[in-house]
Structures are given as C-alpha cells and as structure tokens.
Regions:
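Flavin (FAD/FMN) cofactor-binding and adjacent substrate-gating region
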Residues: 1-55, 60-61, 67-73
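Conserved beta-strand-loop-beta-strand element in the redox core of flavoprotein oxidoreductases
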Residues: 66-84
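C-terminal lid/capping helical subdomain adjacent to the catalytic/cofactor pocket in oxidative enzymes
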Residues: 7, 214-270
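A short alpha-helix-loop-beta-strand transition element characteristic
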Residues: 1-14, 108-111, 247-255
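Hydrophobic/aromatic beta-strand patches that form the interior of the parallel beta-sheet core
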Residues: 60, 90, 220-222
C-alpha cells in the first residue's frame, strides 16, 4: 500500500465517489490511496506475448493437452496436432493445474477454483466516472470500479467452489451484485449491460505455488495465484526463473522477505 494512503471522512467520500451513500445508512469513513493504479490487462498480456516471441518462444493456442508422460529424463506432452519434448515442463494451467498434474502422474496439490462474478452497469445519465477510484467495502461486501467514462463494473466478491470450467454467472449472484450496488449507492440498477464469471484458484494455504514437484523430476508448479496473477506476475516470474533454472534468489524478493520455501509445493505435502 502507498505511504500516502490516508483516512477520509464521509464528506470526502461524497466528493470522490458522489453516488455512495454516506452517514448512518451508508459510509462514515474510508481509506483513500491516491497513488493506486489500474493495470491494463490486455496490454500486459500482449507485451508478455511479444517478449516471449522475441526470445524465440511460440504460443500455440487451440492445442489442448491430451497426454503427458515421462520418458527417461524427459517429458513428452501430446496435443492433437503435435507432441512436445523437454527435460522440464511448467504447469501453469490455472484452474486446471491439478488436472494437468494428475495427467502427468504427479500428485495434485488440492487446488480449489473459486468462481467470481462481475456485472457491468451504467452510471447516472451524464455522469463521467472515469476518475472514480476502485472502491471496496471493508470485509465482505462488494467492489466497483470504472471502465471508461460511462460504465461501472461491480463484483459481489463471491467465492463459489467450482470444477475447472468455462465459468458462467448464475442469476442469483448477478442479482446479489445489483442489490449490493443499490444498497450502497444512490444508483437504481435498471439494466445490466454485461455479466461474466471467472475462476480464481487457490492452494489450501491461500499462498501461490512456484517450484519443482517433490515427487517428479523436471515438473515445475506455477499455480494458485488466487486471482492476483497480473498483480503478482513480475514477482512470480522472477521467482519462477530463479527456482526453475537454479539461479540466485532475486534481490527484490529478498528485500520483501519472501522465502522460496513459502512458495514451494513441498510445503503442501507435510
């Protein structure tokens, strides 16, 4: 968190996000961080893809894994169009990471995909919301944030256990998200422009996993980011590079007192 984050009173809340209800039936105070920024997820993904290709890598989409087997000191990964061979493989399959491990004959970690839902709504007519901050209630509740000048995204912070799948929102959770917005703001929700769900996958201890499987040579876990994959990707990339290639632990991670053992899949085998 920014050192410039500060507590604000209800009148300040009304100035920053004018639709929020304040007072006894609403918000009476808050914490405001003027230095927080929203990540451009598409720009990050495209930039990383370009960096991968520039380094000689390739991205093969629409290539579902049909089999993984260990042959000698190598792994062979089968897809409908081609098989790939390497002395090490990285399991970064998100909600499917445990399934990929099982396919490879590696013990799963007990990862749990949790469904989360987003709705897109319109602010009051003529109101530009582009400068509004990401706004979240303390504890359970909801959050909302602007997307451009004329649309808001809202989330009820649902965490519904799910099988790995192309998650779809359910009507009850959509209604809950709209109700929470109406309870916390002066905006009546007359229309939901769009709705979708995604899966956030957690290890049993809620910490991310990066490291070689203790029961399989050359099988590297990179999973369990719990919905914070974009935010943690620079640090997790440094950790994964060091751990997979046997390099010195990166100084930025050491400076934050992050220990490789905290990420190791071995911690989940005790």
């Amino acid at each position: 968190h920014s050192p410039d984050a500060r507590q604000i009173a209800e009148e300040d809340i009304a100035d920053i996000v004018p639709v929020l209800k304040i007072g006894d039936d609403g918000f009476v105070g808050g914490l405001y961080d003027p230095d927080a920024y929203k990540l451009d997820s598409d720009a990050m993904l495209q930039s990383n893809a370009r960096a991968l290709r520039d380094a000689g890598g390739a991205l093969n989409s629409d290539s579902p894994v049909t089999g993984i087997r260990s042959v000698g000191s190598n792994w062979i990964v089968d897809t409908p169009g081609e098989s790939y061979q390497a002395d090490r493989i990285v399991n970064a399959a998100g909600s499917w990471a445990d399934e990929i491990a099982t396919m490879a004959g590696v013990a799963p970690l007990g990862l749990t995909p949790l469904k989360r839902t987003i709705i897109a709504i319109r602010p009051p007519e003529g109101m530009d919301v582009s400068d509004w901050p990401f706004t979240k209630t303390v504890g359970d509740g909801f959050y909302m944030l602007p997307e451009g000048s004329g649309r808001l995204l809202a989330c009820p912070m649902d965490e519904t256990p799910s099988e790995p799948c192309d998650a779809q929102p359910d009507e009850e959770t959509i209604a809950l998200a709209a109700w929470q917005v109406e309870q916390a703001t002066t905006m009546p929700i007359r229309r939901i422009d769009h709705k979708w769900s995604g899966l956030r996958t957690f290890a049993p201890d809620k910490s991310p996993v990066a490291g070689y499987a203790p029961d399989a040579h050359g099988f590297f876990w990179l999973a369990g980011q719990g919905g914070f994959g974009l935010q943690t990707s620079p640090g997790m990339a440094m950790a994964a590079e060091a751990l997979s290639l046997g390099l010195e632990w990166p100084e930025p991670l050491r400076a934050m007192d992050i220990d490789p053992a905290e990420l190791s899949p071995a911690r989940l085998r005790r």
